[in-house]
C-alpha cells in the first residue's frame, strides 16, 4: 500500500450467535457502539461502526447471529445478516474456538452452512477464530485451523481474542488491505450511523439481559416513546417501554417492589448519559404484547422489518 492510497469499504461481520462479533466491533473502534450480553442473538439490527485511520476507513456491519431457529422475527434477522453479506466489500466471519472443543458437530452444523454461503460470494473472506485466549495449550486449536483451511482454501484464517484485543491490530491491518482504494465516506470523528434514540433503546435492552440473564425469555423489546431535549437545559427526558410476551415476564422485569426495573433504569441511565454527554431523566414502563415476535407491523415499528 503506497502513501497515496487510501482505502475505504464495507465489512460484514458474520457468524453464529455469541461468536463475539459485537465485542470485536467495540474493541476495534475503542468505543461501545454495539451492546454485548451473554445471551445468544443479542444483536437484532445491522449495527454500523466506523473505524477511521489515516490510511483507511473501515465500515463494519455487525449482524445478527446466523442460526437455524424458526419464527418470523428470526427469519427477518437472518435476512439482515445475508443482506449485509451481499453488500460488503469484505466478509469477516467470526467463529468461537471454544465451541470446536465443546460441540462435536460445530463445524458441520454451525460453520459449514454459513461458510458455504459465504464461499459463493466473489469477495475477500477472512475467518477470525475468536476466544483463543481461553486456550493455554494453543496446539489444541491447530486441527480447527487445518480443517477450516482445507474446507475453504480461499479464506484467510486468523486467530484473535476480541475481548483481550490479542491479534486485533493485525486483523484490522489485514482487513484494511482487502478494501478497495477509495476516499472516506464519513467524517473521521463519526463512529456510527445509528440514531441516538436507537442506541438508547439498545442500552436499556442490554441492561435487561444483564440483570435477568437466562431467566428473561428472548421475546423482549424496547421502544422509545418520548424524547425531550429542552433548549437551554442540559437535560434529556426519555420515556421507554419494555415489551414482553406474557404477564409472568412483566412481573419478572419489574421485580419485587420494583427493585429489578429500578436497577435496570439506573444502570441504563448512566450509560445513556455517557452516550449523550448530558443529564438524563429516564422512565421505564413494562407492557405485555403477546405474539409480538410474529407481528410484522410491530416489528417494522421497531426497525426490525423493512417497510
UniProtKB/Swiss-Prot annotation:
Residues 160-162 are annotated as: G5. Keywords: Cell inner membrane, Cell membrane, Cytoplasm, GTP-binding, Membrane, Nucleotide-binding, Ribosome biogenesis, RNA-binding, rRNA-binding. Residues 212-290 form the KH type-2 domain. It is a peripheral membrane protein. Residues 41-45 are annotated as: G2. Belongs to the TRAFAC class TrmE-Era-EngA-EngB-Septin-like GTPase superfamily. Era GTPase family. NCBIfam families: era, PRK00089.1, small_GTP. This is GTPase Era. It comes from Nitratidesulfovibrio vulgaris (strain DSM 19637 / Miyazaki F) (Desulfovibrio vulgaris). The lineage of its organism: Bacteria, Pseudomonadati, Thermodesulfobacteriota, Desulfovibrionia, Desulfovibrionales.
